[in-house]
Amino acid sequence: MEKTSMFSIHEGKPIRCKAAVSRKPGEALVIEEIHVDPPQAYEVRIKIICTSLCHTDVSFSKIDSGPLARFPRILGHEAVGVIESIGEHVNGFQQGDVVLPVFHPHCEECRDCKSSKSNWCARFADDFLSNTRRYGMTSRFKDSFGEDIYHFLFVSSFSEYTVVDIAHLVKISPDIPVDKAALLSCGVSTGIGAAWKVANVEKGSTVAVFGLGAVGLAVGEGARLRGAGKIIGVDLNPEKFELGKKFGFTDFINSTLCGENKISEVIKEMTGGGVDYSFECVGLPSLLTEAFSSTRTGSGKTVVLGIDKHLTPVSLGSFDLLRGRHVCGSLFGGLKPKLDIPILVDHYLKKELNLDSFITHELKFEEINKAFDLLVQGKSLRCILWMNK
């Protein structure tokens, strides 16, 4: 049997399937039957095998005003699937390929995509509000009443089937377990890449990571892979400290136990003047200031991964900048999805990269609201939701 034959019955036609739909802000997702249209030019339709969720999904499910408050919507942006059907002008992909949908675009054609200096995509990355990458607000999802459902970050993986533009698609080796591969769609890649590509952490260097969620722990894993000599984790939750050891963390600071001392002062004392690299993974301006102050004068580098939901301006000392400290942002860890995710997959297959420890729970897709609760309560790092288990 050809590997495409299992998909041919639905090719070119709408598919009925289950999806978890976010109907109203702050309310539980609703499992319902939807229709997923066939892919158009430069798109593929994917059968999702498994998906996970991160705090971005939780945050967007609660937004109740402004342009980001769109309902009904299918959330989800970390997943692995198999290509079910292909639209016109799709090159490099075929039915049956195992693929990773990624929120960050990589068109491979614009100036930035061709440059080694950036992972920005000048062609597509400025638009994160449309439903489909090349067709604006046109939706590929309809509910049982024929009403459109909004997409999310060009992925929408909380559905048995979804339609994704090839600029957001990475073909991966079928040898990697799909639950581990799903982690590379967003948070874990973001953290590893920040240490690997953005900071370019050197062997024997010192690192401080502020916030030990999945992204922060992944920064530690990336720093470990690069051979960092000391990796300091900063968090309010002491339970994260034991977990952090699995990802290479050597030292921990509970910020509530610092007394009158600033976190940056404690770090400077521990390292003899400050760390070579610091990473802010929470999104608090005050924490960014501390991360910046914790680095060495003359060469210290601070990488910003957290997003302040209020977009508050940050004030940094001009004299500190003048004396050689650096600060930079990091979107998706500086990774070019189509080039760098396969490299991370290869590291995992060679048993060099720890992905297994990020998965703390596995549930059926129908239990998705339980997964949300676990994440909000701080009991889950990454929960894998299986579509057909």
UniProtKB/Swiss-Prot annotation:
The answer on whether this UniProt entry bears the keyword Cytoplasm reads yes
Carries keyword RNA-binding? Answer: no
Cellular-component GO terms for this entry: cytoplasm
Per UniProt, subcellular location reads as: Cytoplasm
Question: Where on this chain does Zn(2+) 1 bind?
Answer: 54, 56, 77, 186
Q: Which cofactor does it need?
A: Zn(2+)
The record, for PANTHER family, names: ALCOHOL DEHYDROGENASE, ALCOHOL DEHYDROGENASE-LIKE 1-RELATED
Question: What protein name does the entry list?
Answer: Alcohol dehydrogenase-like 5
Q: Which UniProt keywords apply?
A: Cytoplasm, Metal-binding, NAD, Oxidoreductase, Zinc
